[in-house]
């Protein structure tokens, strides 16, 4: 393959731009905000799970308190009715009077026990409510951090995308001046060789694989016409000759 020396030099410009695009793409993928958002999102998910559990406990305990208070009210109402019967003299026989007094005493103890249960449930409900409030605040805090990190990530991506668009446009302009067959070979080699399809020959060393060429290869390149497209015998990349090639 033949190409004018100037076209081969421009191929190095295309290569430089492709390297820059690779660097920008890597930087885009490696923004610290990506890992930060991922970590915060995991934290938020765990906290939301804890919050749901705490809210469930809160609602269950609230229902338990309502039931305990209803039990107290029922016992209190029954005791009030018995006391009213006692006060009204409705219990006329000694046995009825004794039974009524015994039931009033039993209900008073039952009411006391139930009121203790209500107090215990109220304490658990208060604790559950505090837990819900704490977790709600923590979820909001983490969500705020996620939003902040997302805003920073989006701003960084916007800046990088702008630079990528600019470099891509510049590559299009320069690559349009490179012969199609040379550019096709370059793109093929670039895909095969980790993003580097053309390299400068500097002081008899290929800048693609960093290997110094054998003297026989140097002699062949020295003897080749200026418009001959030469390849590195080590890595097979396109070698571009310049005044610094050491030929």
Question: What is each stretch, according to the model?
Answer:
Residues 215-216, 241-242:
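Short, non-ligating residues that shape and space the ligands of small metal-coordination modules
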Residues 221-229:
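Short linker/helix segments within small regulatory modules
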Residues 1-5, 19-60, 85, 91, ...:
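Short, charge-rich amphipathic alpha-helices with coiled-coil/heptad character
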Residues 146-208:
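Coiled-coil termination/hinge junctions
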Residues 211, 234-237:
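Short Cys/His-rich local motifs and their 1-3 flanking residues in nucleic-acid-associated proteins
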Residues 206, 232-235:
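Short cysteine-rich clusters marking metal-coordination/redox-active sites
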Residues 54-65, 107-125, 174-175:
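Amphipathic alpha-helical coiled-coil segments
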Residues 67-79, 114-139:
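Long amphipathic alpha-helical coiled-coil segments
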């Amino acid at each position: 393959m033949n190409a004018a020396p100037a076209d081969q030099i421009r191929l190095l410009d295309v290569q430089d731009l492709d390297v820059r695009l690779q660097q920008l793409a890597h930087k885009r993928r490696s923004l610290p905000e990506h890992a930060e958002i991922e970590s915060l999102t995991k934290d938020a998910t765990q906290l939301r799970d804890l919050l749901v559990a705490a809210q469930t406990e809160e609602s269950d305990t609230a229902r338990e308190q309502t039931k305990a208070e209803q039990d107290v009210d029922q016992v209190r109402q029954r005791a009030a009715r018995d006391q009213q019967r006692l006060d009204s003299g409705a219990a006329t026989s000694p046995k009825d009077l004794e039974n009524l007094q015994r039931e009033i005493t039993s209900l008073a103890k039952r009411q006391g026990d139930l009121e203790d249960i209500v107090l215990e449930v109220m304490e658990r409900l208060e604790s559950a409510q505090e837990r819900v409030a704490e977790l709600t605040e923590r979820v909001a805090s983490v969500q705020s951090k996620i939003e902040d990190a997302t805003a920073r990530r989006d701003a960084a991506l916007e800046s990088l995308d702008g630079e990528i668009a600019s470099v891509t446009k510049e590559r299009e302009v320069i690559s349009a001046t490179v012969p199609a067959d040379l550019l096709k070979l370059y793109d093929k080699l670039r895909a095969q060789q980790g993003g580097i399809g053309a390299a400068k020959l500097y002081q008899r060393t290929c800048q693609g694989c960093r290997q110094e060429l054998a003297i026989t290869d140097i002699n062949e390149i020295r003897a080749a016409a200026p418009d001959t497209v030469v390849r590195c015998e080590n890595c097979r990349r396109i070698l571009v000759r310049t005044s610094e090639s050491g030929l």
